[in-house]
């Protein structure tokens, strides 16, 4: 449905409606949130200031080869229409070129704009199929973008693990940790408290569009606290800014919009 609640069936028009809706989700939710009553900086763990500085480092050809081997060929192609299978099949000849591009990006703290374009496919979750809010946006990125992202994420994770920045209670987005481990930890705590005749209370939260509502300014300030260098912060700022997307319905594409 459009803004006047009129049902639209033209694929091009539908793609435009979806794109406008998806690109404004984070902003609309953030504006609806009440202003914080406390300064977020008071929650920082001050001992973390003792660890060394973090900066992205250059990578070798073998690292590119290993990443290409790990990519699934079942993933759809992104905006650049470069299939992952083509990269994997030619990994030994393409790895030096890709390593050069990645290292140039790291040296200049620039994430290329063409790698920040997402092709979005709406996936119906449940409920009224004419209501945009009942769809989940599936963003399909460039295969080369995924390679660069994996490299950056691996370096950040390694730094956080080595310097024990992650709380031991975090199980998501960490190697050798999963939901099973989180449940086991919970059950262990419950068992210990039960045997000690203690009362246990739990709070379970499901944040709506959590990643879409992250305040990038606060994120960068947290990186400053964790001793990220100016170059590394500039790189992440570049990665987060000027991201564009278009929605594809059948074979009709919307215009490009910048994520807010």
Question: Could you describe each region identified by the protein language model?
Answer:
Residues 74-82, 120, 131-140, 181-224:
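Conserved catalytic palm subdomain of right-hand nucleotidyl-transferase polymerases, strongest
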Residues 21, 67-70, 85-86, 101-104, ...:
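Alpha-helical recognition domains of nuclear gene-regulatory proteins
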């Amino acid at each position: 449905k459009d803004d006047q609640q009129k049902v639209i069936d033209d694929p091009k028009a539908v793609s435009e409606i979806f794109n406008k809706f998806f690109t404004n989700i984070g902003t609309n939710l953030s504006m609806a949130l009440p202003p914080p009553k406390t300064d977020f900086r008071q929650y920082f763990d001050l001992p973390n200031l003792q660890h060394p500085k973090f900066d992205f480092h250059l990578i070798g050809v073998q690292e590119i080869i290993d990443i290409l081997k790990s990519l699934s060929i079942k993933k759809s192609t992104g905006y650049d229409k470069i299939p992952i299978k083509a990269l994997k099949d030619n990994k030994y000849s393409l790895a030096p070129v890709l390593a050069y591009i990645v290292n140039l990006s790291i040296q200049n703290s620039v994430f290329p704009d063409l790698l920040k374009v997402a092709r979005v496919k709406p996936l119906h979750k449940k409920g009224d199929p004419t209501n945009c809010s009942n769809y989940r946006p599936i963003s399909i990125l460039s295969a080369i973008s995924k390679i660069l992202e994996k490299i950056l994420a691996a370096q950040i994770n390694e730094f956080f693990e080595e310097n024990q920045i992650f709380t031991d209670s975090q199980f998501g987005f960490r190697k050798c940790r999963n939901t099973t481990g989180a449940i086991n930890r919970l059950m262990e705590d419950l068992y210990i408290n039960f045997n000690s005749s203690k009362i246990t209370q739990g709070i379970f939260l499901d944040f709506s569009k959590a990643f879409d509502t992250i305040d990038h300014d606060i994120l960068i300030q947290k990186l400053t606290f964790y001793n990220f260098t100016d170059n590394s912060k500039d790189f992440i700022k570049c990665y987060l800014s000027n991201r564009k997307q278009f929605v594809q319905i059948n074979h009709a594409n919307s215009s490009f919009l910048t994520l807010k």
